């Protein structure tokens, strides 16, 4: 045995020990944390999958790797564990006790957003502290007040007319109409109108706008981006991968937003106080320099564009597409709706009077039922248990626990909505509907209710009224007997709703 061999062996062993020690040092905290989460955590006795108790990666597995949505598993898990409360993460639970919804989302609620869930969000969605949120919401509120939304009806009418012309051109060419894209174009144009004081048109031609193509691509990676944001950024550097396409889409989306923002800012400054159309950019520029606290609370408009496009257009377009599907899938619903629209055709075709359209009872029932059954924001939006803790059933939850009750848990509760998987607008009409509006919660409730609720209702009512008053349509495409969807923070249909225009009833 030579001295050289001993020295070489000692050198190899030293590197082995270094690597082993490094691995132990890196993994030990994770292992110890996992053991604590499963066996010693205050939530250890709450039923649920052990993997969910072990790590938040379990939710990521369902949300992104399986691309189905963790929230779609909750109903199965509640049934499997025979419990109204289940553990869905190391520090998160989900409950189906509907009375608990009032506790979390009532006015003046002290249940704050879960920082760990929203840490990679920006703008309005990321605001945890009530003061900052109230300041920003108050700053934007006039843009989304009923009076301001009523004033958007002429723009929406113009956009609908342009869309209808495009739909007729496609029909004349023997094509079907992809309503998902038509509706996304309409809803995005409306929210951009509020974001910028510019006349931005996404509907000049029959081609789908590149801005919308880019946005759709970004939404396919939404869970990855809000969970592990550095991963897509690094992987996007690899040529030829889907992440490279993601990077290209992000660049396209960002370039459009930056160009619109810069042009709007320039025009606003050049106007030197002259009256310009109200918008996010105008309101930001109107902030006074001496109000430092307010300026700190209100983000730069460009930082919040994605949130408003996703929350203000994608959810509305998705819901409206679902409405088209359910109306056209049910001859009785379609007939009842068209009869009502025909009886009031003048307020749609001639006057386009939103104040009258919004009072059509069956139209409103169809919209409420669509919001219920489609659940545009289906996932958990966790809130933190305040000081003092709380008891749900037989389980005590300490302060700091993340608690969710999804809209699905409400919308498909058989005690509130008999036959919950059936599309029944009539449930919202007449004596049997008394008290049901309390559970019309698609836009949430309380201080964090969606700021764009009034805009969404304008679009839903007017778009459905216009198209079903004007066109006879039939479903085509691959939707089949039911709509297949996934949870990408907002719900997304896997198959676009497509229709064939049978007749233009206004010609």
Swiss-Prot record:
Glycans are attached at residue 247. GO terms for molecular function: heme binding; iron ion binding; monooxygenase activity; oxidoreductase activity, acting on paired donors, with incorporation or reduction of molecular oxygen. Pathway: Alkaloid biosynthesis; ergot alkaloid biosynthesis. The keyword Transmembrane helix applies. It is an enzyme of class 1 (oxidoreductase). CDD domains: CYP58-like. Its cofactor is heme. Heme binds at residue 450. Its EC number is 1.-.-.-. It is found in: Membrane. Its main location: membrane. It is a single-pass membrane protein. GO terms for biological process: indole alkaloid biosynthetic process. The chain crosses the membrane at residues 15-35. Gene3D superfamilies: Cytochrome P450. Disruption phenotype: Causes a blockage in the conversion of clavines to D-lysergic acid. Abolishes the production of the peptide alkaloids ergotamine and ergocryptine but accumulates substantial amounts agroclavine accompanied by varying amounts of elymoclavine and chanoclavine which ranged between 10 and 20 percent of the amount of agroclavine formed. Also leads to traces of chanoclavine aldehyde. It holds the Pfam family p450. Cytochrome P450 monooxygenase; part of the gene cluster that mediates the biosynthesis of fungal ergot alkaloid. DmaW catalyzes the first step of ergot alkaloid biosynthesis by condensing dimethylallyl diphosphate (DMAP) and tryptophan to form 4-dimethylallyl-L-tryptophan. The second step is catalyzed by the methyltransferase easF that methylates 4-dimethylallyl-L-tryptophan in the presence of S-adenosyl-L-methionine, resulting in the formation of 4-dimethylallyl-L-abrine. Belongs to the cytochrome P450 family. This is Cytochrome P450 monooxygenase cloA. The lineage of its organism: Eukaryota, Fungi, Dikarya, Ascomycota, Pezizomycotina.
């Amino acid at each position: 045995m030579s001295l050289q061999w001993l020295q070489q062996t000692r050198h190899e062993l030293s590197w082995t020990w270094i690597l082993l020690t490094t691995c132990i040092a890196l993994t030990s905290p994770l292992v110890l944390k996992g053991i604590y989460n499963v066996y010693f955590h205050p939530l250890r006795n709450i039923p649920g999958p052990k993997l969910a108790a072990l790590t938040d990666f379990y939710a990521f597995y369902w949300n992104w790797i399986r691309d189905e949505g963790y929230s779609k598993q909750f109903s199965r898990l509640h049934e499997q564990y025979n419990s109204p409360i289940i553990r869905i993460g190391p520090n998160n639970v989900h409950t189906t006790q509907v009375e608990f919804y009032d506790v979390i989302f009532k006015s003046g609620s002290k249940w704050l957003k879960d920082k760990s869930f929203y840490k990679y969000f920006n703008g309005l969605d990321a605001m945890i502290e009530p003061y900052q949120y109230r300041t920003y919401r108050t700053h934007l509120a006039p843009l989304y007040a009923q009076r301001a939304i009523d004033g958007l009806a002429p723009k929406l009418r113009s956009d609908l007319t342009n869309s209808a012309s495009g739909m007729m051109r496609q029909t004349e060419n023997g094509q079907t109409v992809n309503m998902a894209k038509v509706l996304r174009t309409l809803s995005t144009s409306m929210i951009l109108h509020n974001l910028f004081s510019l006349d931005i048109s996404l509907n000049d031609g029959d081609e789908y706008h590149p801005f919308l193509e880019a946005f759709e691509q970004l939404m396919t990676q939404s869970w990855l981006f809000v969970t592990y944001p550095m991963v897509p950024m690094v992987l996007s550097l690899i040529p030829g991968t889907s992440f490279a396409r993601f990077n290209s889409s992000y660049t396209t989306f960002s370039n459009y937003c930056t160009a619109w923002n810069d042009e709007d800012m320039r025009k606003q400054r050049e106007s030197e106080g002259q009256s310009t159309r109200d918008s996010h950019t105008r309101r930001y520029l109107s902030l006074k320099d001496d109000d430092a606290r307010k300026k700190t609370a209100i983000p730069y408009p460009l930082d919040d564009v994605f949130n408003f496009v996703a929350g203000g257009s994608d959810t509305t377009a998705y819901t409206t597409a679902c409405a088209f599907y359910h109306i056209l899938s049910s001859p009785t619903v379609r007939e009842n709706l068209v009869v009502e629209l025909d009886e009031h055709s003048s307020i749609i075709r001639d006057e386009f009077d939103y104040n009258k359209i919004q009072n059509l009872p069956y139209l409103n029932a169809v919209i409420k039922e669509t919001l219920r059954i489609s659940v545009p924001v289906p996932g958990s939006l966790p809130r933190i248990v305040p000081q003092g803790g709380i008891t749900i059933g037989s389980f005590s939850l300490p302060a700091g626990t993340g608690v969710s009750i999804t809209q699905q848990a409400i919308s498909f509760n058989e005690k509130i909505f008999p036959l919950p998987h059936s599309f029944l607008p009539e449930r919202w009409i007449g004596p049997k509907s008394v008290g049901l509006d309390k559970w019309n919660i698609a836009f949430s409730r309380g201080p964090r209710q969606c700021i764009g609720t009034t805009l969404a209702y304008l679009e839903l009512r007017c778009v459905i009224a216009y198209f079903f008053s004007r066109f006879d349509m039939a479903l085509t495409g691959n939707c089949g007997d039911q709509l297949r969807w996934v949870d990408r923070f907002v719900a997304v249909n896997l198959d676009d709703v497509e229709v064939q225009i049978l007749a233009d009833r206004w010609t």
